[in-house]
Amino acid sequence: MLFSPPLQRATLIQRYKRFLADVITPDGTALTLHCPNTGAMTGCATPGDTVWYSTSENTKRKYPHTWELTETQFGAFICVNTLRANQLTKEAIQENRLPALAGYNILKSEVKYGAERSRIDFMLQADFRPDCYIEVKSVTLAEKENGYFPDAITERGQKHLRELMGVAAAGHRAVVVFAVLHSAITRFSPARHIDIKYAQLLSEAQNKGVEVLAYKAELSAQKMELNEPVPITL
């Protein structure tokens, strides 16, 4: 994924009301950015960090600038735009960069499924193969080199795991992909210290046939690419 036009840089002043962030550009201009992340953003929104933002061509948007990346004072890059996790995963599947998800010729997005009427991020299909249901989660919470999900209690995430267990029980392929969008993370675990129920459900899901995968994105202000498998400890 190439950023075109190129991202612009600024210095973070504060994030507030979850969806907004005040920044100062290198020439001293004050801007308010849209923050496309409803999570806690622990370690991703420290005042003084460098932020990289995109600008929409839609002139009707109240906040035309979108916060895409944080470059921390320690040199780590973090993608804070949660929409990018799905885009990067879709691109990686289509370009056959994820061997575990190769061999399908049809990719559908936002398909309704399950007893709780959820929407799956992606469904892959191919002749003579069971349908493959994929749920994608964005991982940005880091403690040293350890990456964790979620960064806050997520009942929605718990529901998705229950739905995937149902998919696996019905004979289909069920997969949860943790897209690691933090350059300092080298391994992944569920955040048992934040959402114990999610961690327990993830272990249960794996035991019932749900595949748990984690891939790390190469991040820069110029491009992003999901391709590197990350070790998982449940």
From Swiss-Prot:
What Pfam families has UniProt attached to this entry? SfsA, SfsA_N
Output the Gene Ontology terms for molecular function: DNA binding
> What are the record keywords, sorted?
DNA-binding
Keyword DNA-binding present in the record's keywords: the answer is yes
Which ranges does the entry annotate as DNA-binding region? 201-220
Q: Which domain of life is it from?
A: Bacteria
HAMAP family in the record, alphabetically? SfsA (MF_00095)
What does this protein do, in the record's words? Binds to DNA non-specifically. Could be a regulatory factor involved in maltose metabolism.
The record's similarity note reads:
Belongs to the SfsA family.
Q: What is this protein called?
A: Sugar fermentation stimulation protein A
